């Protein structure tokens, strides 16, 4: 049965792929061949390849019964699509193979995922069953389901997104949950094998009324600290923060096996753009801690659905720690995308300075002299629909998008960093922009939807002058 369901899913995907349009399809980000994509799953280096699985609906560009899509890469940048890895339909995953993770268990690629069943009709979140399941593969392509390995504690129904790792000769698992009081929490388990698990403790939980569910947990050490990374649902916006439908971020602290997680800071968003959710981390072949997120947001318009697909991933980002602060930089492998180079000489800008008439896939580096720039706002624009600018009056860096025909309008912003200089590294793809600020101190990621004729890339300044100290641009391919 499983094979026939996989075969049917692959056939449906092939049919959808035949009619997929490319108006917004990315040049250098991982997106589904067709159909729907959301959370990254099972990110791992295995058998001399990077593997990225993901939540996938191959029958439609809309969310539906979740499969696990699959892609592989030798550099985390150039991805090759593989056959669909998991299809729902067995007793314990009848209505979805929800998110999870991957580990190498003595040469066996092991996927730990959530089996989801609707108990009272599809979409009724008040009546579900969620259990953790195992699927295994020796070749890294074809998987056999091994059944349920963990059931939820008494009184808990929402119980999903297992992230598994090995530490101190023990398997560990974090799972996102909603307690009976509708409060988000992360549960920690320890295992003698991938099939035998014991509850360790509630690793962390929301304050009452703060958020009702904590999804997609991850737990890892970096520098001198541990980071609990997760995606809370139900947080209220506070000023400029938490403006998206749902958030993703980290809590720092100290932990060792058998101990409490001693939090040393508050929840901080990982990305300050419009579109970032469900990040998952993994260890690269050389030991770097890498994170990839879903570059979309629940309940947002997704214009690419008109062309038979939806969803894409962020660039792979290397995490590092500096003075207790988490930094995110594009993996150095991203430089392999660079083709034609265009230097941007230092200049004073008082109106518009065109960089490219038709920017499809580019990397731009800009260094602004904040103290010497008196324009009310100045920065980079793509067509009339996307601006990344410094607002001198509010002293904030603003990422604004305006596509009224797509029902998309609004901005995200962060405080300008202290100091005289602002360094920006910007990746623009067909339908996305990712901005790395001051060598990874902050990141802003958003989907954008310019029409093909709306891709003029320019620098600009309004009501004053802006001083560019350094600039560079690369075509990417």
UniProtKB/Swiss-Prot annotation:
GO cellular component: cytoplasm
Any one of the GO BP annotations: sucrose metabolic process
Major subcellular location class: cytoplasm
An annotated Gene Ontology molecular function: beta-fructofuranosidase activity
Annotated compartments: Cytoplasm
This protein's pathway: Glycan biosynthesis; sucrose metabolism
Residues annotated as catalytic: 39
Residues holding substrate: 36-39, 55, 63, 98-99, 160-161, 215, 298
Family in the record: Belongs to the glycosyl hydrolase 32 family.
Record protein name field: Sucrose-6-phosphate hydrolase
Protein species of origin: Escherichia coli
Name of the gene this protein is made from: cscA
């Amino acid at each position: 049965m499983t094979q026939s369901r996989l075969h049917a899913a692959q056939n449906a995907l092939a049919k959808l792929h035949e009619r997929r349009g490319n108006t917004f399809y990315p040049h250098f980000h991982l997106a589904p061949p067709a159909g729907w994509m959301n959370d990254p799953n099972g990110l791992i280096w295995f058998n001399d390849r990077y593997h990225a699985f993901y939540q996938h609906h191959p029958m439609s560009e809309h969310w539906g019964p979740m499969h696990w899509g699959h892609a592989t890469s030798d550099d985390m940048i150039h991805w090759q699509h593989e056959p669909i890895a998991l299809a729902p339909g067995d007793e314990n995953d009848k209505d979805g193979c929800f998110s999870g993770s991957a580990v190498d268990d003595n040469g066996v690629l092991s996927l730990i995922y959530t089996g989801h069943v609707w108990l009272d009709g599809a979409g009724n979140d008040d009546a579900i069953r969620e259990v953790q399941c195992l699927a295994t593969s020796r070749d890294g392509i074809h998987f056999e389901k091994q059944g349920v390995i963990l059931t939820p504690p008494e009184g808990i129904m929402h119980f999903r997104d297992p992230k598994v790792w090995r530490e101190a000769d023990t398997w560990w698992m974090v799972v996102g949950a909603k307690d009976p009081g509708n409060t988000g929490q992360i549960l920690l388990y320890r295992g003698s094998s991938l099939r035998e698990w014991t509850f360790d403790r509630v690793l962390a939980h929301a304050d009452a009324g703060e958020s009702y569910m904590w999804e997609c947990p991850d737990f890892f050490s970096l520098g001198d600290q541990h980071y609990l990374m997760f995606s809370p649902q139900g947080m209220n916006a506070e000023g400029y923060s938490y403006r998206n439908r749902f958030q993703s971020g980290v809590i720092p602290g100290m932990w060792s096996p058998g101990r409490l997680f001693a939090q040393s800071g508050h929840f901080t968003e990982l990305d300050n753009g419009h579109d970032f959710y469900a990040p998952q981390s993994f260890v690269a072949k050389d030991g770097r801690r890498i994170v990839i997120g879903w570059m979309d947001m629940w309940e947002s318009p997704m214009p690419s659905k008109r062309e038979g697909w939806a969803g894409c991933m962020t660039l792979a980002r290397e995490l590092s720690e500096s003075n207790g602060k988490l930094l995110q930089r594009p993996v150095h492998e991203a430089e392999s995308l660079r083709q034609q180079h265009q230097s941007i000489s230092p200049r004073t800008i008082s109106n518009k300075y065109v960089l490219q008439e038709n920017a499809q896939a580019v990397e731009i580096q800009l260094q602004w002299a904040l103290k010497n720039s008196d324009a009310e706002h100045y920065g980079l624009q793509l067509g009339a629909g996307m601006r990344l600018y410094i607002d001198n009056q509010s002293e904030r860096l603003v990422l604004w998008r305006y596509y009224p025909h797509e029902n998309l309008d609004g901005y995200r912003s962060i405080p300008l960093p202290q100091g005289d200089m602002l360094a920006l590294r910007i990746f623009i793809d067909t339908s996305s922009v990712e901005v790395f600020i001051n060598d990874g101190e902050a990141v802003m990621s958003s989907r954008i939807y310019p029409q093909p004729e709306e891709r003029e890339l320019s620098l600009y300044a309004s009501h004053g002058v802006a001083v560019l100290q350094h600039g560079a641009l690369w075509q990417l391919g």
